[in-house]
Amino acid sequence: EFLETYRLAGLVRKYSDYIRYPIKMLMPHSKEKPKPEDAPEDYQPEYETVYEDETLNSMVPLWKKDKKDITEDEYNEFYRSKFMDYMKPLRVIHSHSEGLTASYTSMLYIPAQAPYDYYSKDYQKGLQLYASGVLIMDKCADLLPDYFGFVRGLVDSSDLSLNISREMLQHDRQLKAIAISLEKKIKSELLKMQKDDRENYEKFWEAF
């Protein structure tokens, strides 16, 4: 199963879409065969499968770009494609942080509505966690306190090891420092929204 072409391509796009180097693979494509010179009038095109080099990863993560170079539509499209929520988020918190304990980039979203299962026992909070552009955890719960469990987004740090386990993450000093920093950023943004954007803050209050 894991050696199937589209399975391999899917794994690359999920876990290594944002590493800095191109990942290429021979991918099958349907191509029309040349029409014979003596083809009859009712000739129907024939197709064959050919294999061509295709770059599977996009290489340039949106969160690595400067905020001033990213449009609101790009932020919203990324949110829709990553988190399958087609309502425009109320807020985007995009920041680059340098610290003695850990340096990281984060891109967080305050949704306009609660996830459909938010109030059920099956809901799993957490942010996507990347190490140098490689996804190492899809939902890292340790990055968010329970009361900010509705926040969606990701964190990327070059200070984390690619082969770190879930058990090691729970005791990782760098991850704890990142979590504390994120909590402060979210609180600050919500207070700012309460003061400067009352309409959206009231939408947030009703949703959560």
Task: Describe the role of every protein-language-model region.
Residues E1-F208:
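Long, intrinsically disordered, charge-dense linkers/tails
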